[in-house]
Amino acid sequence: MESTSNPTVSFLGIDFDLTILAMSLLTITIIFILVFWASRKMTIKPKGKQNVLEYVYELVNNTISQNLGHYTKNYSLLMFILFSFVFVANNLGLMTSLKTHEHNFWTSPTANFGVDITLSLLVAFICHIEGIRKKGIGGYLKGFLSPTPAMLPMNLLEEVTNVASLALRLFGNIFSGEVVTGLLLQLAVLSPFTGPLAFALNIVWTAFSMFIGFIQAYVFIILSSSYIGHKVHGDEEE
């Protein structure tokens, strides 16, 4: 397989991945357009595109309510945005392939570990901020000594593993999916005999990858809401 890389630009000594930046911006644009279009001329009795939008929002709302309880309404919009971004980003790489011998110009943003770890760190940041807001700094820090001060190292390790597992799970599934898609595309142009087989396999794999993309977005908000719920409910559980 030919090795290609994403084009980059350096600014203030930092390298920025232009492909990832462009695809992330495209993801946000697609979500904005779809939500804006689906929310126009809304009626009391939903139908058509409004019905789809409300169904997705309710799906997210019902999913996170298991972890957030009466705090659900405070985080519904955040989780809807996270779910939408991860789902669309997961599937962008399945739409087409755009590359030269040197550079790749089209990929799923979530096939890049930098994007995934950034999303995980964002969730972790929100968890800590919400924990401090609910309990105060003293009460929040005291939670790391629960149930006994001896658990401090394990509690700190748990914070790190939560971030790492959230990012690695998403990255591993989406990146591997793009690798298989790339192999099938290469198989398609290998010879006239392998082309039809690769085309058929790619259709099946694309459908399966879209399902995996949905599952990963779904799991992402389940875990994110679980982490936030643990922080905001901690004082109630004690």
UniProtKB/Swiss-Prot annotation:
Cellular localization per UniProt: Cell membrane
Pfam families: ATP-synt_A
InterPro entries listed in its UniProt record: ATP_syn_F0_a_bact/chloroplast (IPR045082), ATP_synth_F0_asu (IPR000568), ATP_synth_F0_asu_AS (IPR023011), F0_ATP_A_sf (IPR035908)
Domain of life: Bacteria
MF term (GO), any: proton-transporting ATP synthase activity, rotational mechanism
Membrane topology, as annotated: Multi-pass membrane protein
A cellular component term, taken from the record's GO annotations: proton-transporting ATP synthase complex
Gene3D superfamilies registered for this protein in UniProt: ATP synthase, F0 complex, subunit A (1.20.120.220)
Annotated function: Key component of the proton channel; it plays a direct role in the translocation of protons across the membrane.
Assembly, per entry: F-type ATPases have 2 components, CF(1) - the catalytic core - and CF(0) - the membrane proton channel. CF(1) has five subunits: alpha(3), beta(3), gamma(1), delta(1), epsilon(1). CF(0) has three main subunits: a(1), b(2) and c(9-12). The alpha and beta chains form an alternating ring which encloses part of the gamma chain. CF(1) is attached to CF(0) by a central stalk formed by the gamma and epsilon chains, while a peripheral stalk is formed by the delta and b chains.
Protein name in the entry: ATP synthase subunit a
Species for this entry: Streptococcus agalactiae serotype III (strain NEM316)
